[in-house]
Amino acid sequence: SPAVLEEHHDAQNRMRKTTDQSRYCQPGAPSGFIALGERRWAVEPDGWHAARDHSWGLYAERRPLSPDSKWLPPKAPVGPQRSLRFWIIFRSEPFSGFYHLHEDSEGVRRQFDDVFGTPLGGAITRGWSGESFAIADARHSAEYHPGTKVLKNVEMTLTDARGGVWTQLFETAGPPWLGQTSGYYPGGWKDGGNVHTYHGSEELALEWDEFDFSRQPLLHDGYKTEDGHFDGFGRGEVKGQPVQGNVYLCSVRTTTPHGDVHWGAAHVEHYYNGPYRPYGFE
């Protein structure tokens, strides 16, 4: 289906913009192959799911290029803080789409002055040229693996702008992916850098390693990280303390307002910044 453009993200701190960014998100049906050494996998649309997003503008700061916070004054208070984040790209043909939602620690959706400030946005679309249904309201009921914040499943109840009610059940296919392994967070590369830093080549830099993330949360400190240089997106991660991934591959069952049921797959990003009392997380 066509890409969905998120509402523009804008945040300020001490009269300076800290976020000024646009992003589009899009589901897809991939075809081709994946090769690793002598192994090769055929990629066909009926068995694989694709999701992509692209952003441009001023985004979240990342170490080691951002200033060390010890040299800066504390961030100014900005009111209620974001806790819960769901960011979902799905395909359950003939319907596909994208939506995201953010809530505070009491489960209230509101505008936040941060990098992911939008309360709710997105759309469900029938194919490339079919109808598009803007999402006007969303409710969720999530289940987690005992004693963790690792998602097991979540049911979303969505109301579109025309009053139609959709339900989607997402069930995780395995443990979440850790973005640290892509170099997205501080210390993701062996030199201590990240995706924004130079690694010895302006054309292509390659490195590899092996980790076991089958059980989460777990200890994973990255490479050459220092205290205060480890956290990503203000999630409260502390070096030497367990962490977990935040990106899930899920099956999805979509039920339309007319009762039709369609199955597919989804990319679900989900995590918490601090406590979230509706689910008992402190």
Describe every region a protein language model picked out.
Residues 1-282:
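Structured soluble/peripheral alpha/beta segments that form catalytic or ligand/cofactor-binding pockets
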